[in-house]
Amino acid sequence: KAGPRWLVIGIFRIGGAVIYGFILNKILQWGNLLTENNILIWHPEIGPVSLVIWGKDQIVGLTMMFAILMGIMLLMKVLEKFGLNRLLQRIFKPLLTKLGIGKEATNITIIGIILGISYGGGLVIRESRAGRIPPRDIFFALVLMSLFHSVIEDTLLMLLLGGNLWGILFGRLIFALSTVWLLVHLINLVSEKQFRKYFFKTFL
């Protein structure tokens, strides 16, 4: 709805996840990192499980997930009170400018990175329909948000599930910025006609 063709964004989102996972796995194997056995807190019972027990387990699991998400949301509110969002904005704004994303799209991109693609994407749709952001900046911003979004919430959730901070935050950030930097330079070689034909649809 914001303009970029869904197939292209889908390729970047799914393909980016697969490629980053592959690269991270190879780096960890090469460095013999994170090779220790994972310690599971919960061990499922072996054997047939009745429908009633399965239903109870699902309710417990969903309740725990809901409690974790509520805790993360509460923590995000606390961090916002202490100005973490403003700090992240000061960090990301010069990075986005150096990537080649125009100033009209930087604030919206930062919102998507911090709060999630649903918030940032919604703002991009509104600004795109109003014609306030150039099409190429919209495209670059959404690709970046597809690769790196909900930086606080997703990171906290993955840490609770046992993820490694370097892989789920810093490595992901480096991969996303590198991908968008390369994309900006390649797309700038494409004519406006080709860009709108293959990457961006024009609103009627």
Predicted regions and their residues:
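Juxtamembrane/transmembrane-helix boundary motifs in multi-pass membrane proteins
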Residues: 4-9, 48-56, 60, 64, ...
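Alpha-helical transmembrane segments of multi-pass membrane proteins, especially transporters
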Residues: 5-17, 82-85, 108-113, 137-145, ...
